[in-house]
Amino acid sequence: MSQLKGRAFYWRTLPRSNDGFPRRARDLAHEFALPERSRCAFLQSRPRRLGCGALLWRQTIAHGPSERMTLDEIRSLTEGDLSAVDGVIRARLKSAVPLVDQVAEHIIAGGGKRLRPLLVLLTARACGYQGNAHVEAAAFIEFIHTATLLHDDVVDGSSLRRGRHTANRVFGNPASVLVGDFVYSRAFQMMAALSSQPVMEIMSEATNVIAEGEVLQLMNAHDPHTTEQRYLEVIYRKTAKLFEAGAEVAAVLSGATPRVRQELAAYGRHIGTAYQLVDDVLDYRSNPQERGKNLGDDLAEGKPTLPLIHALRHGDEQQRVIIREAIQRGGVTQLEPVLTAIEATGGLEYAARLAREHAARAKAALAALPESRCRDGLAALAAFSVEHTT
């Protein structure tokens, strides 16, 4: 990777409007529909340069006129709910079958940001919920996410996640698939225990959509003709749908009105889309040690993500040939010229801009909620979705 040093993807210093929002000349036609002087202003931070030309966003957001909220500060708004979720996760992963316990311990030790449970907890509290069912809901949302990761790593042949060997690398593909099934079914046991038909309807539909997304991604693999629309359909189904479902479940448990429920579902959908768009940018511009994944993993798996799709659409003939062949063959032997083509065509910048637009829409949806610290936390998560670096 030493050859990649010096190829840092620079963002110009962004001039700001009177409202404090960053502007760039090339983006003046893409003004965001943000509420004027919103209480939690959407902040675009200047990146910092790390090794391998990392494209990074600081994990802070504007809170009020002068404060900034870190991710840990966002977590603190749940007042112990996240700790309760961790306890539920550990308890519900217990099994009389030793191998299940071993894989479960490997999963727990792997950690994670717990963004989806955090979204559920904050949404419920922002809606005024006073019970405890949101803790179970946050846990089963995380279980669905965990099950999909276990299966994804098998399908993709991944060996590294969060800087550690994947479960399939340690225990083998059969064990990883079967324990994924266990985690998935345990999630539905927990849903059933809530005795809420609307929750079951939301989650059964969501898991079906997620499964379809996995198949669509499989169909797109090694296909250089994948369009932006097809790509966005995949990330909605694979990633954004679970965020959407988590926010909607929290609204249902809180007894929110249909309008609020709809707005919160939109919030989850947009924040999930933004998060995945940035994740796909980071695949080409990140610090592998910090992120816990190899640079160019998507390219190695032949996944035509948005930076590649944009470069194919706007590159010259030589660049298009290089990218088409790289997608078709997979692997990272062409990573260097692919990076050059992506940077020359603004592919990373384009994907990041689209992510910011979705984050802005997520934040706008929060207008349906009354002002509160937890609503501020949800706005902070919208900013984090485009600022995360791992």
Task: Describe each model-derived feature in a short phrase.
Residues S2, A29-H30:
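N-terminal amphipathic/hydrophobic targeting modules at extreme N-termini
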Residues Q3, R23, E36-Q44, L50-T390:
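All-alpha prenyltransferase/terpene-synthase fold signal
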